[in-house]
Amino acid sequence: MGQTVTTPLSLTLDHWKDVERTAHNQSVEIRKRRWVTLCSAEWPTFNVGWPRDGTFNPDIITQVKIKVFSSGPHGHPDQVPYIVTWEALAADPPPWVKPFVHPKPPPLLLPPSAPSLPPEPPFPTPPQSSLYPALTSPLNTKPRPQVLPDSGGPLIDLLTEDPPPYRDPGPSSSDGNGGSGEVAPTEGAPDSSPMVSRLRGRREPPVADSTTSQAFPLRQGGNGQFQYWPFSSSDLYNWKNNNPSFSEDPAKLTALIESVLLTHQPTWDDCQQLLGTLLTGEEKQRVLLEARKAVRGEDGRPTQLPNDINDAFPLERPDWDYNTQRGRNHLVHYRQLLLAGLQNAGRSPTNLAKVKGITQGPNESPSAFLERLKEAYRRYTPYDPEDPGQETNVAMSFIWQSAPDIGRKLERLEDLKSKTLGDLVREAEKIFNKRETPEEREERIRRETEEKEERRRAEDEQREKERDRRRHREMSKLLATVISGQRQDRQGGERRRPQLDHDQCAYCKEKGHWARDCPKKPRGPRGPRPQASLLTLDDQGGQGQEPPPEPRITLKVGGQPVTFLVDTGAQHSVLTQNPGPLSDKSAWVQGATGGKRYRWTTDRRVHLATGKVTHSFLHVPDCPYPLLGRHLLTKLKAQIHFEGSGAQVVGPMGQPLQVLTLNIEDEYRLHETSKGPDVPLGSTWLSDFPQAWAETGGMGLAFRQAPLIISLKATSTPVSIKQYPMSQEARLGIKPHIQRLLDQGILVPCQSPWNTPLLPVKKPGTNDYRPVQDLREVNKRVEDIHPTVPNPYNLLSGLPPSHQWYTVLDLKDAFFCLRLHPTSQSLFAFEWKDPEMGISGQLTWTRLPQGFKNSPTLFDEALHRDLADFRIQHPDLILLQYVDDLLLAATSELDCQQGTRALLQTLGDLGYRASAKKAQICQKQVKYLGYLLKEGQRWLTEARKETVMGQPTPKTPRQLREFLGTAGLCRLWIPGFAEMAAPLYPLTKTGTLFKWGPDQQKAYQEIKQALLTAPALGLPDLTKPFELFVDEKQGYAKGVLTQKLGPWRRPVAYLSKKLDPVAAGWPPCLRMVAAIAVLTKDVGKLTMGQPLVILAPHAVEALVKQPPDRWLSNARMTHYQALLLDTDRVQFGPIVALNPATLLPLPEEGLQHDCLDILAEAHGTRPDLTDQPLPDADHTWYTDGSSFLQEGQRRAGAAVTTETEVIWAKALPAGTSAQRAELIALTQALKMAAGKKLNVYTDSRYAFATAHIHGEIYRRRGLLTSEGKEIKNKDEILALLKALFLPKRLSIIHCPGHQKGNHAEARGNRMADQAAREVATRETPETSTLLIENSAPYTREHFHYTVTDIKDLTKLGATYDDAKKCWVYQGKPVMPDQFTFELLDFLHQLTHLSFSKTKALLERSYSPSYMLNRDRTLKDITETCKACAQVNASKSAVKQGTRVRGHRPGTHWEIDFTEVKPGLYGYKYLLVFVDTFSGWVEAFPTKKETAKVVTKKLLEEIFPRFGMPQVLGTDNGPAFVSKVSQTVADLLGVDWKLHCAYRPQSSGQVERMNRTIKETLTKLTLATGSRDWVLLLPLALYRARNTPGPHGLTPYEILYGAPPPLVNFPDPDMAKVTHNPSLQAHLQALYLVQHEVWRPLAAAYQEQLDRPVVPHPFRVGDTVWVRRHQTKNLEPRWKGPYTVLLTTPTALKVDGIAAWIHAAHVKAADTRIEPPAESTWRVQRSQNPLKIRLTRGTS
């Protein structure tokens, strides 16, 4: 009890040295990690019974060995060493294995005797319990002697025995009574445990007629006393390993423990051992806590008394004697409480999603599925599935979660509500048993396929016959045309034969005989007439000849395929169809029939075989065929060959031209020249290494790599995205790939909650498709791992220049070499249907899929691990790996060939496959990662250059980003790339206006030109030091990294980068320090920490060692010193002068300068500015600024004083900071001392530093912070810097603030501080910010009165004041009309208040001037404000109109859809028909809101009952405006009227009926308690049809001429009144009554129509605003203005909006508002000669 369990796997790991010795004896090698993986993960999946902990059973080992040694693709040759070693350990076991080897039957042994306890007098049997059986009375038999096994060995076979609990062996029987003598073996078998009995049954011959008994830890012995038999270790081991954990399946483990408690009667210690073995520590504590909660007190309720709880369920070992009645009672009670604790602790939190996730399996019976469903209810919900109240929920779950075919049929059962759960199970069983077998399904699919093929074959034959018949008919017509043409040529025209004389022969043209007597005419039978040749060149110009085959080619222009005729005689290419917008350029085209002017198209993007280009075509509609001219043929690099089969147009390399589309970053591959390898792979390399090539070795499998387990994020849930629609061409294109992957086992069928769509991608240049899975949603839910894929930027740094023989290998289908663990395969499922293969469901990958975000990293790491031994074994070779691209470099050709052979052998042995087509073996020049490697240097390939050069001028930010991204890949070859591209980068920012100007075009051309002249760069040699030449210009760092090659310096990389805003504002010497630091950090990626010598035209080392603290912050200073003063890695060379073009040193020396001196001179703004007092100063002033809080408001003031008096003081606006006030005071002092010598004292460090140091720094960096934002107090700083130059001589001195001395400095500072506080407290601060350089405000001298102003003033009675030089009215100067307009317009722009509110504000406020024409000007401003017109609401002045109604029932209907929630049985909508004459309503519940539903109900419900309607009125819903509905209406002659959009009053009758029906349904559901609104709909319709209308009549009375049947229902016995005269009279009077009702109603409706309606005031040509019905955040309420084109009394149509607009949704626009831009109309021709195209443009 409590001992550690030993398994075969752990046993082998503990004796691993012996295992390796056994493997060595078998001549194999094994690895410990691989040993564990195969035993615990791989071999259990063979389904031969191999346990995860291993076994030494020879039968199971043999089964696994058969699987491993299986021939073909299903074998596992890599696992042979391991299974052979397992077999050797089992066949010849070492001493530590022997106890675990499957035993042979031992000789007969007597069973051991059980220890007995001292006898006690018999005791009464405890009362029987429903949980535990009664103990049987002891048998009076003598126990047989028992031979105990060796204590050193295991008691039982831990691996071959079945786990308890055991089946009850049944009641024991005995033929004789016990005695004191020796008892025969057949009568006195002792009590033993079931395990011992089972072992004895296996290892001993069975004992005949032996007495059987129950073996428990507590059992009653032969002497009446209880004996204790502890649990065996094998019981506990088997219970734990053959049952799920408590957290996984608490019900199953609880049932196991319940059976153990029931049958074994364990003691308190046994219970603790059982719980400790089967439960975790946390689970055990939870069970014990729940059990203690279940302890009940004397009242039968759970108690909280600790004494009672500890007595009933102690946590420490109690003193319970199981040989006493009391002790056994305690144990029984303890077990009951323990079982209750297990049940309560096993209850999971309520999780209905878990219940919903239980679905029926493909081959699972309905009854088994129902049991699983009920178990889920018990486990994850607090409901009991057996409770009758929960039967409905369980039944619904059973229906919805059954198999799709069973669920659909169960949903269609009649009277589904009355079905019980048992009825549903029986129906499901019937459906399940009637399913077709797999053989029947295959037979059905085969039969359907054959029928489909037969129909297709018949259709093809019919089409072929029709095509032949049509071809023969056309050929006959053609022959007739040819022959008739030839006859006409012979009979007339210039070719008519001369007229014969009367005696002239028509055959030989001689006279004297006729043709029938001509001796020269051949005699004999007439031969067959030769067929007319239509395609010969010697046909003498006969009519009707078919032209020779014309070379054609299909290109994609503007995204559409266009078939061109190749015409080398055409200079330009021609389009005949309408190409869209045309440019303003035109050209004169000279053709065979004359000349004509045609226009050019705008630039179109054309997909060529050489890439995407933009091209402008001539639009010639008269041309019979689109022409491919010489200009585009030149871009295409086309070649035309004339052969016997006709003309062929091919590309530059002889390949057929096709439509091509690809990513822009891969475009360089289009220009690559496909050169075959120098070494013939087919002869030697392919045959020597067949397993290393994909062409000969098949699909690879990295068998050394364990299956990959993909980890999900903690909050991830399965995502299911349906498959996108796929064309037939694409489906047929990817079908062979799917079939191939299925045959190879890479794809397998599955059922998964995950699903992502499959995308067919067409391969460039071919018609082949390849399947690509969209795994973006899966990638979002998978855990991110750190990417370890090498950086291509510095990957080649590990390739020394001495290795100049290269081999490049590209692994094919690399990701498919790694296996996926079965638990992770379901993540990558997708849909696939193929009736021919019998597949209709999901497929998933068993290998690592492409498109998965972690695939490159996982494969790169796996390949690195597998190739680690190769790198160790070949230290002289350089092997670089970038995912699946390998580069092997050697110093000689022989080493390269030997290394390549070893690498191919290694790859083949490891299970990887290389592509022979892409292999470059043992060459001195190879292409790797888009670069050309040759002689220790790397070049830009011509393909990459042509890619950049072939890109058109960018027109959008996206195109510019594409260009910069493509060119940026080549920036190492372009000196100063960052400086060249500087004008381009601002245009790529979001929200920036894309304006391509001369600067951008110049930068664009410079980058292309630099790319054409790109030099070769040497590969970094890590054995040599590096030299970095750095220069800086206008905030851009430029440098070149070089290495010595003999006497020369060979460039390794060109570097350039833009400095940050702070560094860009420094003096030149400090900018050089920043440039060196930036480039040194970038260079570290290439130098790999090797020594670096920095050469620059500045003494940088001295600046770094003693940096000026005025310019650099401490953090930046520390960073620069740590980076540049690392003497072990970075050294500074002598100062050199650099060539601006090459960045290399010039032969002559540059100008010498001292950087420290220059910095000292450049730190200030004014050179003579000092901080020491001037002895001859004209003034000595003190400045101060004060900012403080007073009564919750921040007050501020500034002052300039002497020691005794205030020179200047002013209050500043509220909220002004103290720093700003100090700047203002200092600036004011400098301005007042213009042209004088000044000493000025300030106690502000901020103002003092700004004037002396920081102001100049801010100015140099553009007044920006380190984050690129604008600094605070920008205007005040600029004003201060400008004012520094006003005094003749200046000294700004800092003095401590708040001094208490009596010297002049302290007195002046106190005076300035006091003056600033007093002025801030005394004066009211201004409402606007003080501007240093503010223009003077308007005064009366600026008033200029116009002639109109003077006339208005004269009428007003104003007088002119000569003294004030202005007009005066009511004692106030009069403001001119123009000034009034400017002031009021500015005020309105700030507030956008209405006329009345603005006027009220002006009247309440005091104004020192009188505003001339204030009210008129203000009204004009408010009425013409465009923003107010677009936003302000407007009251509708349109009066309500009158609806048109029918003249009799059934002629005029209004229709509408309304949504009813919640939906029931799939019904979500209600289709409502209302007869406008009578108000009669018909309503139908529908599942969809479609035109098909409308027409179906109209034809099947309305037409048969009410006749064909004449008018239908609806809104503009999709179901009513669709072509289906309108076509049906046209065919039936129905006038379908569409009402105004967003105007429900137009359909007011049906809209009101919708509301009535919904309100009635709501009341009915509340009254009845039912949610079935479909069932309650007839009652709602009954109410609507019997509700009196406006004229006091109900729709029922109007329609049927009788009162509504509300109370007097007819007698059920209708036979009595069938022939009643009163009934007949009533029926006869019905016709008359209806007419008496209908005529007055029709007259009343007509009277409403005849009543005059006041129309809206809008007329054709007016300008109106249109209401925006769906506004977004901060979007104006009105749009426009628009021009009115058509009007009706209630609606109007405007220019630019297709639908009619109700007059209530528009408002007049003021004509003075800026009108919309004038439109110009352009007429264009179309393909149809009877149509023209009108295009409107803005002039």
UniProtKB/Swiss-Prot annotation:
- Residues the record lists as binding Mg(2+) 2: 1184, 1222, 1243, 1313
User: According to its UniProt record, which cofactors does this protein need?
Assistant: Mg(2+)
PROSITE patterns per record: ASP_PROT_RETROV, ASP_PROTEASE, INTEGRASE, RNASE_H_1, RT_POL, ZF_CCHC
Locate the Reverse transcriptase domain: which residues?
742-933
Chain residues that bind Mg(2+) 1: 810, 884-885
Q: Where is the lipid attached (N-myristoyl glycine)?
A: 2
Amino-acid positions noted as binding Mg(2+) 3 in the UniProt annotation, renumbered to this chain: 1456, 1515
Location of region: Disordered: 111-222, 435-500, 514-553
Q: Which UniProt keywords apply?
A: Aspartyl protease, Capsid protein, Coiled coil, DNA integration, DNA recombination, DNA-binding, DNA-directed DNA polymerase, Endonuclease, Eukaryotic host gene expression shutoff by virus, Eukaryotic host translation shutoff by virus, Host cell membrane, Host cytoplasm, Host endosome, Host gene expression shutoff by virus, Host membrane, Host-virus interaction, Hydrolase, Lipoprotein, Magnesium, Membrane, Metal-binding, Multifunctional enzyme, Myristate, Nuclease, Nucleotidyltransferase, Phosphoprotein, Protease, RNA suppression of termination, RNA-binding, RNA-directed DNA polymerase, Transferase, Ubl conjugation, Viral genome integration, Viral matrix protein, Viral nucleoprotein, Virion, Virus entry into host cell, Zinc, Zinc-finger
Motif LYPX(n)L motif: list the residue ranges.
131-135
Question: Where exactly are the zinc fingers annotated as CCHC-type?
Answer: 503-520
ZnF HHCC-type residues are 1388-1428
Positions with biased composition (Pro residues): 111-127
Name of the molecule in the record: Gag-Pol polyprotein
Q: Which organism is the protein's source?
A: Friend murine leukemia virus (isolate 57)
Corresponding gene?
Answer: pol
